[in-house]
Swiss-Prot record:
GO terms for molecular function: DNA binding. The keyword Oxidoreductase does not apply. GO terms for biological process: DNA recombination; transposition. This is Probable transposase for transposon Tn903. It comes from the Bacteria. Transposon Tn903 codes for kanamycin resistance. InterPro entries: Tn903_transposase, Tnp_DDE_dom, Transposase_Tn903. The lineage of its organism: Bacteria, Pseudomonadati, Pseudomonadota, Gammaproteobacteria, Enterobacterales. It holds the Pfam family DDE_Tnp_1_5. Keywords: DNA recombination, DNA-binding, Transposable element, Transposition. Required for transposition of transposon Tn903.
Length: 307
């Protein structure tokens, strides 16, 4: 089969969105500047926080977008304030590192309503280890540390609805219930690959009344009658000898949009985390997701098939 060809129909708008990604005021907007310092009355004893959670979030987002270290991000933001003639200071890099362990970074979008199709996948983000070239030439060393980023993406808008970071030894199916519980929006169907073909995942989808589009593994058997979605997939597999027809008829192939989201993460922000503490790494990953959702909202390509 010849490769399909598509034409972008909103190139002018999308091109402006791509250019806007490099704008400093796109990431450091008036809302962040006005709420830079903490104004709320402290609810506990001790020294009050000087900088707001939004300020810490903004620093972490800029750090990821421009691929800076914490020290470089501090100097970068201070220079922006100087050029803007704004009487603000960037939080000290040690303050950001400490606050990142407890800050709650929101990546929720303003989109509301039913989600027709949620697609789910995970990818690895490296914390420690050699680059691919060294591994190719000399082999890998023993110490290689990874974290797993789990994403649930709206297949229509490309917005990340749910996100979580886990240790490398946490399986996709184990992380699934906590991931899907992050949203209370109605979801019509959810797609995931064969790694999620477990009762734990299917039970969570049944609890939320979501149609499960998870391909059963080769030679899979039937489950009790309440797992109707899976049993239909198993029956189709036995009739045709594979899951190919089932994937085509159920629109399962839309799950590739989750892989597109993973590709965007690696291409735009790199495939590694730099903070040393695990809680800080969670904040760094959520800042990454927040930045990606902001880019998505600014503009995405719209295309039509031409061949």
């Amino acid at each position: 089969m010849a490769k399909q060809k598509f034409k972008i129909t909103n190139w002018s708008t999308y091109n402006k969105a791509l250019i806007n990604r490099g704008s400093l005021t796109f990431w450091l907007d008036d809302g962040a500047i006005q709420a830079w310092y903490e104004s709320a009355t402290p609810s506990s004893r001790g020294r009050p926080q000087r900088y707001s959670d939004l300020a810490i979030t903004t620093v972490l987002v800029i750090k990821r977008v421009f691929r800076l270290t914490l020290r470089a991000a501090q100097g970068f933001i201070d220079s922006i304030f100087t050029l803007m003639n704004v009487p603000l200071r960037c939080p000290d890099y040690s303050c950001v590192s400490r606050r990142a362990k407890s800050v709650n970074i929101s990546f929720k979008t303003f989109t509301r309503g039913e989600i027709a199709h949620l697609v789910i996948d995970s990818t690895g983000l490296k914390v420690f280890g050699e680059g691919e070239w060294k591994v190719k030439k000399h082999g890998q060393e023993r110490r290689r540390i990874w974290r797993k980023l789990h994403l649930a993406v709206d297949s229509k808008t490309h917005e990340i609805i749910c996100a979580d970071l886990s240790l490398n030894n946490v399986t996709d199916s184990e992380a699934f219930p906590g991931l899907i519980r992050q949203t209370h929006r109605k979801i019509r169907a959810a797609s995931a690959d064969g790694a999620y073909d477990t009762r734990l995942c299917h039970d969570e989808l049944r609890r939320k009344k979501i149609s499960a589009l998870i391909p059963p593994r080769k030679g899979a058997g039937y489950w009790p009658g309440e797992y109707a979605d899976r049993n239909r997939a198993v029956a189709n597999q036995r009739m045709t000898g594979s899951n190919a027809r089932w994937k085509w008829t159920t629109d399962y192939n839309r799950r590739s949009i989750a892989e597109t989201a993973m590709y965007r993460v690696k291409q735009l922000f790199g495939g590694s985390l730099t903070l040393r503490d695990y809680d800080g790494q969670v904040a760094e990953a959520m800042a990454l997701v927040r930045a990606l959702n902001k880019m998505t909202k600014a503009g995405m390509p719209e295309s039509v098939r031409i061949a």
